[in-house]
């Protein structure tokens, strides 16, 4: 299963990947908006959107891509791992 994590804290990016790996998932983590963001997202099985730490522009792009390619988006307010 492939997961895209959007938002969160820069320092927690490797922790997010470790958690996904422990559940047998391959993860991409985007804490900031890179160039060609739409292409880098790809078509994952799930997108996790940390709403408290993500920019409006990134959230809109993820939602548009999810609607187009029909993958679910889990919206979580907190970016904590507890």
Protein language model regions, located:
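An anion/phosphate-binding loop that grips the pyrophosphate of nucleotide cofactors and donors
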Residues: 44
